[in-house]
Amino acid sequence: METPPVNTIGEKDTSQPQQEWEKNLRENLDSVIQIRQQPRDPPTETLELEVSPDPASQILEHTQGAEKLVAELEGDSHKSHGSTSQMPEALQASDLWYCPDGSFVKKIVIRGHGLDKPKLGSCCRVLALGFPFGSGPPEGWTELTMGVGPWREETWGELIEKCLESMCQGEEAELQLPGHSGPPVRLTLASFTQGRDSWELETSEKEALAREERARGTELFRAGNPEGAARCYGRALRLLLTLPPPGPPERTVLHANLAACQLLLGQPQLAAQSCDRVLEREPGHLKALYRRGVAQAALGNLEKATADLKKVLAIDPKNRAAQEELGKVVIQGKNQDAGLAQGLRKMFG
């Protein structure tokens, strides 16, 4: 994220007229990249739960719906929970931040100071107002520790944590949420203690934190939240990737589980890459072969999909999920051939 210029807390930004802000907003919208891949039917198998040699350090990033959120921000910003006298008279495009997973758009109301942001272990003093959920954060100022504590299990926990990761000390921001027509949520970060980067942690600490993230990811996946699960698996992988090679065998499981999430989220390219990392360490990993086959079919690479699915059936001939997926691939191939033949007849007939 581009860091805005450092201002004193509470200082208003009047560097541009409203017309220039609106122009920059439209230009900023044009730069938003949306992932529009259509998800296939979800795999009929389960996550990898046992330990075996695997993550993609990339966490699925899609910003579908960002344009709609920004339009709502533009129209609803006057409904904020604070006094309008605290609002900057003019904002720049750099004052908008799009959460990579598309869960919200942040508009900076009051810029913070410094360059540091909360990280693992940081104790943050925050004030949150206007959450639409039935049970939001506690009223008044609250202290939350990044990456630790039961607050992360709450409906609002993941959203606040993602936003805090992008904030500087003293920053106040409005969050526009998909499907939320009311006033924007407002979040203020008064202060935070210095946490630790992953390279500062002991090996045992990294492994323990990674196990917690993996367990949380599996809970979210089973609850029907592949996006949240992928975020947990990605965090666990980033912790383990800092360990000396070859790394713990849990990496293979995490990559395989991340691939399952990416398939459900309509990201077959990322899913195939996650499976590649599994198969580099364990060429006969059935679930990785199956998921890569599904991903290749979604990408239209039918020969590669067929090869992976046949490998699964060679190892496990009774694997029903692979049998069904291979049948779909065969039908898809016949339809492609029929379409090509029809096109050639029209061209040369």
UniProtKB/Swiss-Prot annotation:
Modified residues (Phosphothreonine): T3
Keyword Membrane: no
Protein name: FK506-binding protein-like
Tissue-specific expression: Ubiquitously expressed with higher levels in testis.
GO cellular component: cytosol; extracellular region
Job description of the protein: May be involved in response to X-ray. Regulates p21 protein stability by binding to Hsp90 and p21.
TPR repeat feature ranges: 210-243, 252-285, 286-319
Domain of life, source organism: Eukaryota
Quaternary assembly: Forms a ternary complex with CDKN1A/p21 and HSP90AB1/Hsp90.
A GO BP entry: response to radiation
Native source organism of the sequence: Homo sapiens (Human)
Region of interest (Disordered), ranges: 36-55
PANTHER family in UniProt: FK506-BINDING PROTEIN-LIKE, PEPTIDYLPROLYL ISOMERASE
Keywords attached to this entry: Phosphoprotein, Repeat, TPR repeat
Annotated effect of mutating K287A: Abolishes HSP90AB1 binding
UniProt cross-references to InterPro entries, sorted A to Z: FKBP4/5/8-like, TPR-like_helical_dom_sf, TPR_rpt
